[in-house]
From Swiss-Prot:
Leader sequence segment: 1-22
Protein species of origin: Oryza sativa subsp. indica
Top-level taxon in the UniProt lineage: Eukaryota
Cross-referenced Pfam families: COB_C, COBRA
Family per record: Belongs to the COBRA family.
Positions of the pro-segment in this chain: 444-468
GO cellular component term of the entry, any: side of membrane
Function of the molecule: Involved in determining the orientation of cell expansion, probably by playing an important role in cellulose deposition. May act by recruiting cellulose synthesizing complexes to discrete positions on the cell surface.
GO BP annotations, alphabetical order: cellulose microfibril organization; plant-type cell wall cellulose biosynthetic process
Sugar-bearing residue positions: 31, 156, 164, 228, 340, 355, 374
High-level lineage: Eukaryota, Viridiplantae, Streptophyta, Embryophyta, Tracheophyta
Keywords carried by this UniProt record: Cell membrane, Glycoprotein, GPI-anchor, Lipoprotein, Membrane, Signal
Protein name: COBRA-like protein 5
Length: 468
């Protein structure tokens, strides 16, 4: 009995931990839903429209895009796909006539590139797997393809749902649940006068966990203010620096000559790359050489050597204080020479975001994950102006200022109140500085007169008393 109780407790703890890991408190309903709509039956299977909808408010899927996989329940094959393709055909040797598109029991599907012939396209396809965040671009948060499945069931009762769904977006981090049959999707005809519906529909829900995606954070935060000369940098090794130092083409440390082109390698896999993160000095010849911005097939970053070793740094500067308002400056810097960020997003949590007056160079959208609690907002770039964060270098930064109206019941510059509680970049939480390092408010001037003036006044009073 005691053993059974312990086993049950362990199971409940495991389930609780797995749910908690994939839960984002600033986007509690965020997920990616994959929906299969069977739109017609074929002699040996069915044709399904597969739609992937990103319901995450501020996390997108960047290049090289998504990869969706699953395991067939029986011996199904993919006869054809429109709007996507399987990465491997597999062993189709038993087919004598028409050859299927894929015979793999565990196919992996990727989006097509833009510009493919029209007869290979379908609505919401062919974007190289790039999917926007729902809060930033709802129209771009959907991706779709059509698949013809053979050697499968041909009725609602004989179709076996695929299992073991996986989603890479583009790297790890997503966990998908089982396929669940739901009420059939209803469609409106173009003239909106007739309704049709799918023959069968099932959905799969995938949630993201930053802990599964990377051992280390992928961004860090630094602070400064007008009322204190202290600049609080990102924490040392905020994104991982390894435990056995740097290795590679020279140490690049204190004895390295500026501009000698030496590089270092972070053996700790900072920024989520376990194979070691190479870095180069910002003033080295290599940083200015042709090809330094060329991405690698494995996605390994090339970072500028810093104490924090993060691909992204977010700097929050408390800039000005007015009678009824105060102003903060936000600057985002890219330290990765091999990656730019299209349609980047920045999320900040701060109590005064409930009274934003103006954002000067970014788009701003309040996020209300808990109804009327308005302390979280999303910043993103202006289209064709700064919605692209360039690679590391002189143009690898974007910045804006935020003007907020004071609420005198809560406003203060003391004890770090003016700095954000949390910062997210592209959906990943950034490493904050330790609270005891925040720029402090200098002591106020004494209310009474200076000591020298008080002493002089006391001496004069004594003289007057003696004279009297």
């Amino acid at each position: 009995m005691e053993l059974h109780r312990c086993s049950l407790l362990a199971l409940l703890l495991a389930v609780t931990c797995s749910v908690a890991v994939a839960y984002d408190p600033l986007d509690p309903k965020g997920n990616i839903t994959i929906k299969w709509d069977v739109i017609s039956w074929t002699p040996d299977g069915y044709v399904a429209m597969v739609t992937m909808s990103n319901y995450q408010m501020y996390r997108q899927i960047l290049a090289p895009g998504w990869t969706v996989g699953w395991s067939w329940a029986k011996k199904e094959v993919i006869w054809s796909i429109v709007g996507a393709q399987a990465t491997e055909q597999g062993d189709c040797s038993k087919f004598k006539g028409g050859i299927p598109h894929s015979c793999k029991r565990t196919p992996a599907i990727v989006d097509l590139l833009p510009g493919v012939p029209y007869n290979q396209q379908i609505a919401n396809c062919c974007k190289a797997g790039v999917v926007s965040a729902y809060g930033q671009d709802p129209a771009g948060s959907v991706s779709a393809f059509q698949v013809s499945v053979g050697l499968a069931g041909t009725t609602n009762k004989t179709v076996k749902l695929p299992t073991n769904f996986t989603l890479a977006g583009p790297g790890p981090g997503y966990t998908c649940g089982p396929a669940t049959i739901v009420p059939s999707t209803v469609y409106l005809t173009p003239d909106r006068r007739r309704r049709t519906q799918a023959l069968m529909t099932w959905t799969v829900t995938c949630t993201y966990s930053q802990q599964l995606a990377s051992r280390y954070p992928t961004c860090c935060v630094s602070f400064s203010s007008f009322y204190n000369s202290t600049i609080v940098p990102c924490a040392r090794c905020a994104c991982g620096c390894g435990h056995d130092g740097y290795r590679g083409n020279g140490g690049g440390g204190k004895n390295a000559r500026a501009g000698d082109g030496r590089s270092r390698r972070n053996s700790g896999g900072g920024g989520g790359h376990s194979g070691g993160t190479e870095c180069i000095m910002g003033d080295s010849k290599r940083a200015l050489s042709a090809g330094v911005n060329t991405p690698r097939k494995d996605g390994a970053p090339l970072l500028q050597c810093t104490s924090h070793m993060c691909p992204i740094r977010v700097h929050w500067h408390v800039k000005l204080n007015y009678k009824d308002y105060w102003r903060a400056k936000i600057a985002i810097t890219n330290f990765n020479y091999r990656m730019n960020y299209t349609q980047w997003t920045l999320v900040a949590q701060h109590p005064n975001l409930n009274n934003v007056t103006e954002v000067f160079s970014f788009q701003y959208k309040p996020l209300l994950p808990y109804g009327n609690i308005n302390d979280t907002g999303m910043f993103y770039g202006l289209k064709f102006y700064n919605d692209l964060l360039m690679e590391a270098g002189p143009f690898g930064n974007v910045q804006s200022e935020v003007l907020m109206r004071k609420d005198y019941n809560t406003f203060t510059f003391s004890q770090g109140w003016a700095f954000p509680r949390k910062i997210y970049f592209n959906g990943d939480e950034c490493k904050m500085p330790p609270p005891d390092s925040y720029p402090y408010l200098p002591n106020s001037a004494p209310i009474g007169p200076p000591r020298s003036v008080a002493a002089a006044a006391s001496a004069i009073l004594v003289v007057l008393l003696l004279v009297a």
